[in-house]
């Protein structure tokens, strides 16, 4: 049997990466163009009002200047496409992955995960097809057991790949809506939304670090042990023994898969994005800075 897609994981990763990159880059430009003019007008008016209040003594001079500087920096990031790309997008799409790669235990680049999964898929499929040819068409029990073992293996590979691929896609999605979210940082009532957005980006960065540490070890271990396990299965005496060996192979992959699937929850707890108290901490920190400025 010839596969329609020789390297399915690499192909799917490339297709989704190109689709989301193209679509979200276009959406980012549209968002920045839409908010640019009204935001600049509103901020200009706000700065004028802030200046009047400072002159009249209704707002502390140091506090007023600090607010104007903060708002100016945020607006520059939102309306300036080059600024947003250089200081926000490049940090989470380039700087963070390069930094995370330095902590690799195996030396296996995280970007090669789809290719590694393709190799595992191709090698196991060859053995599965060989065993399938040994099962008689009337042997329903062996057919059912064989199909179960095959689907379990598919599930473990695809779930691990899904966690890996979701990191890159969700990073692009969060960065694409960034200008809209950062507008909320200007206003006191919506500042917590921007804090949560930053928290989610930090969480994804932590998840990328955990994947680089755990997923690369798991996949490299699976690829190393796979040849030996498939050799034992292939030379088993009976077809039934080979099918049992396939389930033992599934158990091995399920163990590694459980480690990878648990990583998003671990990253979320470390990053604090799942904690209801996270935004309260951000607000409390902001109030402390405000008190220092007034003092």
Swiss-Prot record:
Entry keywords, A to Z: Crown gall tumor, Membrane, Plasmid, Transmembrane, Transmembrane helix
Alphabetical list of InterPro entries matching this protein: Conjugal_tfr_TrbL/VirB6
Membrane topology of this protein: Multi-pass membrane protein
Entry superkingdom: Bacteria
Subcellular location: Membrane
Membrane spanning residue stretches: 35-55, 68-88, 167-187, 201-221, 226-246, 251-271
GO cellular component terms given for this protein: membrane
Protein name, per record: Protein VirB6
Source organism (scientific name): Rhizobium radiobacter
């Amino acid at each position: 049997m010839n596969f329609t897609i020789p390297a399915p994981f690499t192909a799917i990763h490339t297709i989704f990466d190109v689709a989301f990159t193209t679509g979200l880059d276009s959406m980012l430009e549209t968002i920045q163009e839409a908010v640019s003019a009204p935001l600049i007008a509103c901020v200009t008016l706000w700065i004028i009002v802030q200046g009047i209040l400072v002159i009249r003594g209704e707002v502390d001079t140091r506090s007023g200047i600090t607010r104007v500087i903060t708002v100016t920096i945020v607006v520059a990031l939102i309306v300036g496409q080059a600024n947003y790309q250089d200081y926000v997008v490049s940090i989470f799409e380039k700087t963070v992955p390069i930094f995370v790669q330095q902590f690799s235990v195996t030396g296996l680049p995280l970007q090669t995960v789809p290719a590694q999964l393709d190799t595992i898929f191709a090698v196991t499929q060859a053995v599965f097809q060989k065993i399938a040819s040994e099962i008689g068409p009337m042997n329903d029990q062996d057919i059912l057991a064989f199909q179960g073992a095959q689907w379990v293996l598919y599930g473990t590979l695809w779930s691990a790949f899904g966690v890996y691929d979701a990191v890159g896609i969700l990073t692009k999605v969060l960065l694409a809506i960034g200008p809209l979210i950062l507008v909320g940082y200007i206003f006191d009532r919506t500042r917590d939304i921007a804090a949560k957005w930053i928290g989610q980006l930090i969480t994804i960065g932590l998840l990328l670090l955990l994947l680089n540490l755990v997923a690369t070890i798991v996949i490299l271990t699976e690829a190393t042990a796979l040849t030996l396990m498939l050799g034992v299965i292939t030379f088993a005496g009976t077809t039934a023994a080979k099918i049992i060996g396939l389930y033992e192979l599934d158990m091995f992959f399920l163990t590694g898969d459980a480690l990878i699937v648990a990583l998003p929850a671990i990253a979320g707890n470390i990053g604090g994005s799942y904690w209801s108290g996270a935004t309260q901490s951000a607000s409390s920190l902001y109030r402390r800075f405000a008190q220092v400025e007034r003092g």
